[in-house]
Each structure stands twice: as structure tokens, then as C-alpha cells.
């Protein structure tokens, strides 16, 4: 739990049970104040990511880097979830991450309904819920489920994951195992 945690031990145990019942075993409670937000991550989105301007939950359709940083500082408790997989082709990754992201959206909803009105999820990959993204927030077909990825919120996932003791490396081939991370902001 976060350094100034608002969540009691009983609440934490109740949420742990919920996560585990839904099949999530590889996660840690974290202090969201320690999530590393960096301008270089946004630059990688703008100059290097094929989703830029084509996804309603990716830049330029997300808050500025300073607004992202302020967002994380409003929370005391969060959870980082780790997902690992090796795939042969980029399409395989997107198919897998879409399934995972849909399940994660349901988890966020369940946490919200459990009384955590501030629950907010960052998907483990770009949204990808719809086959045909509108590319704008206004035109989003799934506004209650669509969420940004940590990278689109300028999170340095590499440094943040390592800081919390998780493995992550740059892959040089799609067939190498990847570690993807989702963040559930709770309170």
C-alpha cells in the first residue's frame, strides 16, 4: 500500500481476494506517488508509435504530461499488475492485449462498485477494444470501458516496474517474452 494509505488492512485483503478470484496473481500494492512520469515517454508516443493520433486513448487525446503527473499525485493507493507472454507476430500481441484489457476494464468496474469511486485503470497496452477506433474522445464507441495505457499517460513503465521489483527489458524480437504492466489507481 501507499505511504499515506487510506485503505485499511481489511479493505486490502478484500481487494486481494477479488483480484485473486478473477485470476490476477502477479501484482503488488504500490504508492502511486512513486510512479515515474517523464516527458521522454510522451515523445516516444509522438515520434515512434503507430497509435499516435489513431487511438482515442492515446496522445494527443490524453492530458498533458504535467496533468498526468498531477493525476498520479492525487492517489495514495494503487496496484501494478504484471502480464507476461511471448508472441510470434504483432497481431498476436494486440489480440492478446485486447482480451486482457477487456477483463481489466471489468475489474476496474468491480472495484468501483465495491465502494472505491476513484478507481481508474491504465490498460497494459493501447486500448484496442474496438476494431475501428474513432481516434477521438468525442467519437469513442466505448467511453465507459476505454482507458489509456500507462505510456499514453507518460509513465516510464521501465523505471517504474523496476522500482517495484518487477522485470522488464527491451525486446529485440516479437518471439521474446514480454512483460506488460497495468495500473489500477484505487484511492
Predicted regions and their residues:
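TRNA-binding/sensing appendages of the translation machinery
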Residues: 2-30
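Catalytic cores of enzyme domains
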Residues: 25-30, 34-55, 59-187
